[in-house]
Amino acid sequence: MKGVQTLKTKREFDYVYKRGIAFHSPYFVLFYIPDKDMRIGFVASKKVGKAVQRNRAKRVLKALFIQYFDQLPIGRYVFVAKPKLLGADFKRIDQEMTKILERIKRRKW
């Protein structure tokens, strides 16, 4: 994961939300914009739960990102957790990520 920077400011997140393509799953939403460098952000709102649940949701999403890092095209990503994420098995979440990854690769940029 060398060379990956995190999105830090509201402006950076808003840029990805407005200009990016949203890929929805029952457990998370992935916003993506092709770019020349790899930047990543993780979001879990209070709808997901209290701080402990939100942090766990972000850890699960980070684990997904690390697992698929080599297969992801370079760009800016924002993973947004949904409340169902915490009740789901990691295997099921992994399957959803595989589907989204295929959709990203099929799309013509």
Swiss-Prot record:
GO annotations of cellular component type: ribonuclease P complex
Keyword Hydrolase: yes
Keyword annotations from UniProtKB, A to Z: Endonuclease, Hydrolase, Nuclease, RNA-binding, tRNA processing
Broad class of enzyme this protein falls into: hydrolase
MF terms in GO: 3'-tRNA processing endoribonuclease activity; ribonuclease P activity; tRNA binding
Biological processes annotated in GO: tRNA 5'-leader removal
InterPro entries given in the database record: Ribosomal_Su5_D2-typ_SF, Ribsml_uS5_D2-typ_fold_subgr, RNase_P, RNase_P_CS
Enzyme Commission code: 3.1.26.5
Alphabetized Pfam families for the sequence: Ribonuclease_P
Reactions it catalyzes: Endonucleolytic cleavage of RNA, removing 5'-extranucleotides from tRNA precursor
PANTHER family: RIBONUCLEASE P PROTEIN COMPONENT (PTHR33992:SF1)
Function: RNaseP catalyzes the removal of the 5'-leader sequence from pre-tRNA to produce the mature 5'-terminus. It can also cleave other RNA substrates such as 4.5S RNA. The protein component plays an auxiliary but essential role in vivo by binding to the 5'-leader sequence and broadening the substrate specificity of the ribozyme.
Protein family per UniProt: Belongs to the RnpA family.
Oligomer and partners: Consists of a catalytic RNA component (M1 or rnpB) and a protein subunit.
Protein name as annotated: Ribonuclease P protein component
Organism name: Nitratiruptor sp. (strain SB155-2)
UniProt gene name: rnpA
